[in-house]
Amino acid sequence: MNVQQSKFRLSRWAGATLALGLLLSGLGAWGLALVNEQQARMALEREAELLAEAVTRRVELYQYGLRGVRGALLTAGEARIDRELFRRYSLTRDIDREFPGARGFGFIRRVAAADEAGFLRQARADGQPEFRIQQLTPHDGERYVIQYIEPVARNGQALGLDIASEANRREAARAALETGQVRLTGPITLVQA
């Protein structure tokens, strides 16, 4: 065997070794990418589950608060609810600590369009002489008016808002009214934000 043939054989072995190395490296990288993708997917699913559980716990916390308000209102009787009683009830709660993220709690009065003038007289006689109904979009149907809201200092702009004047609020309010269950609205912009 001459030197020329020996060099040729060596270069073939070197080429084959290089090709095999590249193939094995490629397969290893592909396998590692699959493992990494699977681990990333599993980590994302775990995080999504944890986030969903946290959101569920937060919503349940708000439900407890709303049920507490409902219990107080049912105990007092809807006809006896006034601004001072609602304010005193709200003082028994530490809204920021008990319901983190909530801006406050309110009482929404269902008012037939034909009864609007009488409702306004009653609301103004209840220590709110400037009370007026605010509509985001004019409509002829019944009103769902935020009559009381606490704390007023950071929610005053919502006082008098007819939530039936905006579709997302109206749909959530009707569903809550019909089912007796808490409902979330679709995306909205708070008037007091």
Predicted region positions:
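Intrinsically disordered, low-complexity polar/acidic regions
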Residues: 41, 45-49, 74-193
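Aromatic-enriched hydrophobic runs in primary sequence
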Residues: 14-20, 31, 50-53, 89, ...
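Juxtamembrane membrane-water interface segments immediately C-terminal to a transmembrane helix
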Residues: 31-64, 70-77
